[in-house]
Structure formats: C-alpha cells, structure tokens
Amino acid sequence: MEKGEDPGSLIKVIHLLVLSGAWGMQVWVTFISGFLLFRSLPRHTFGLVQSKVFPVYFHVSLGCAFINLCILAPQRAWIHLTLWEVSQLSLLLLSLTLATINARWLEARTTAVMRALQSIEKERGLGTEVPGNFQGPDPYRQLRDKDPKYSALRRKFYHYHGLSSLCNLGCLLSNGLCLVGLALGLRSL
C-alpha cells in the first residue's frame, strides 16, 4: 500500500477484534481462571485441566499474533513506517515469538514433568486435596526433602513453568501496549 492509504474498515475491525480478543483471553487465563481453579480443584485435577487448556490457549495466542502481523505488515512500505508502527510490528513479532516458544516447546515439556511429578505423588497418596487445606506439615515439602528424584523433577517443573510464565507475561504486555497505542490513536470514543 502507498503511504497514508487507508487499509479499510473491515481490516481495522478485524485487527482490533483479534488483538483485543487475544489480550482479553490472556488476562482471563493469566489472572483469573488459573487462580480460581487452583483454589477450587484438587491438585491433580487442576493440573489435568491446565494441561488441556494451555495447548489451546498458547496456539490461539500464536494464531492471533500471526493474524495481526499479517494484517499490519503489508499496510505501508517499510521505508515509510513511523516509530510507532515499527514498535507495534516489533511488539507483535515478540508476541508471536513468545507464543510460539510456549506452544511448541515449553508447554509439552512442562506437562511431561508435571505428569511425572503426579505419578510420584499418587504413589504416596497425594494429589486429591485442594491446595491450602493442609493440617500439619506440608506433605509435598516432606516428599521433596526425602525423595531426590521428586525434588529434581520439581525444580525442572518450576524452571519450565517460570519460563512459560515469563513468555506469557511478555505476550500479555506486548498486546496490551499495542492496544494502548491503538486507543491513543482514536480520534473519538
């Protein structure tokens, strides 16, 4: 497209719907549903639910970032891009990269380690309780202190889970900043 040419109302609406839908989904999964489920479900049931939700969630995030990049990238000749347009493309590329890392690499590894942890926990009669309902010493801490294999698996799980959380927060922040930029560019409400 030539500099300054309007991409059309439909493209603008699709871009806004995909971007805001992705961001809303990310806010829900990151800050609301996970905490509600964690406090309401037995530990292993929570893990099972998350292992089913996260692959879909990460792939939808990846798809939304890809769609938005495909919409935005061809809108202007690259030489005519403003600083904001370059920033927005960079943020969407970052979101696509982080969502891809989560969807294609981290999620499968995190789930595999979680299943190995749950197998050991089941052998010890753990995993059917809702977190935070312990009376007395924490049985998971005791298991971690007594079983080096379990302790190593927990470290590995938290490593993958931490990286996945950072990638997810990066996607959320990238999409949020893109939405802020779009909102600041509105002429009226």
From Swiss-Prot:
Localization, UniProt: Membrane
GO cellular component entries: membrane
Membrane topology annotation: Multi-pass membrane protein
Pfam families noted in UniProt: DUF4149
Transmembrane parts of this sequence: 18-38, 53-73, 81-101, 166-186
Swiss-Prot/TrEMBL keywords: Membrane, Transmembrane, Transmembrane helix
InterPro entries per UniProt: TMEM205, TMEM205-like
Main localization category: membrane
Family indicated by similarity: Belongs to the TMEM205 family.
Name of the protein this chain belongs to: Transmembrane protein 205
UniProt source species: Mus musculus
Native organism taxonomy: Eukaryota, Metazoa, Chordata, Craniata, Vertebrata
